[in-house]
Structures are given as structure tokens and as C-alpha cells.
């Protein structure tokens, strides 16, 4: 029996998107399994897993509107620009108020072009 469809998976921290796809392949026995967008290993959240015929939809799903929620630690810069890195500098963030944070976050609303950090789940050449 060939099952086609889309699974809505809550990817756990420390798992790669590829590991989730591999697990779904192993558990279902379905060969054509893919995901509609990569999440970094330390990120958790919705990972859409496409099965069989539904893999054709992944390019459209990746273009769909997405919403992100983040937890941040103000005042620390790491060598990888994320929580997995070694702290390079620290500053006291107590002088930063909610309005300043909201104003800074406003720059990330809408369509933006972001340069990915050196260490990321960016796909190169395919």
C-alpha cells in the first residue's frame, strides 16, 4: 500500500531534519519521504514531512508564510552567533527595555534577506 500525505512533526532539540526523515522512512517503510524546510538541530518546532506523492508539494510548502517564535538571551555574543557557541563577549542587558526590544524585532517582520551564520543548516549546491 502506498500512503501519500503530510505529517506535522514537532522536531525535538538535537535532532536534525534528516534524522526525522530517516526515522519516518524506517517506521513506515516508505522510500519517498522528504521535508518542507530545514530546522537547525538545536531548534524545535513544526517540521512538515511529505510522504510519497506529497513530496511534490514540498517546494510550495517551503514558499508558504511561516511564523517563528524565539527565546533569546540578551547581552551575550558567541563564536557561532547561536546558543551552541562559546561566549566571546558579555554585557549587562539590564538597561534594555521592552520597547527597545520590540523596535529591534520590527526589523525582522516581512520579507528580509538574511546572511546565515557560518554554522547553520544552510543547504549548499542542491
Where are the predicted features?
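Catalytic/RNA-binding core of pseudouridine synthases
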Residues: 1-125
Amino acid at each position: 500500500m502506498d500512503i501519500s500525505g503530510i505529517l506535522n512533526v514537532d522536531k525535538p532539540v538535537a535532532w536534525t531534519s534528516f534524522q526525522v526523515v530517516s526515522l519516518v522512512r524506517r517506521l513506515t517503510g516508505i522510500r519517498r519521504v522528504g521535508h518542507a524546510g530545514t530546522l537547525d538541530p538545536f531548534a524545535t518546532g513544526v517540521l512538515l514531512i511529505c510522504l510519497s506523492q506529497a513530496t511534490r508539494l514540498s517546494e510550495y510548502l517551503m514558499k508558504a508564510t511561516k511564523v517563528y517564535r524565539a527565546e533569546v538571551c540578551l547581552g551575550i555574543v558567541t563564536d557561532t552567533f547561536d546558543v551552541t557557541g562559546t561566549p566571546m563577549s558579555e554585557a549587562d542587558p539590564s538597561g534594555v527595555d521592552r520597547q527597545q526590544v520590540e523596535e529591534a524585532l520590527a526589523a525582522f517582520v516581512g520579507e528580509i534577506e538574511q546572511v546565515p551564520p557560518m554554522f547553520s543548516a544552510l543547504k549548499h549546491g542542491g
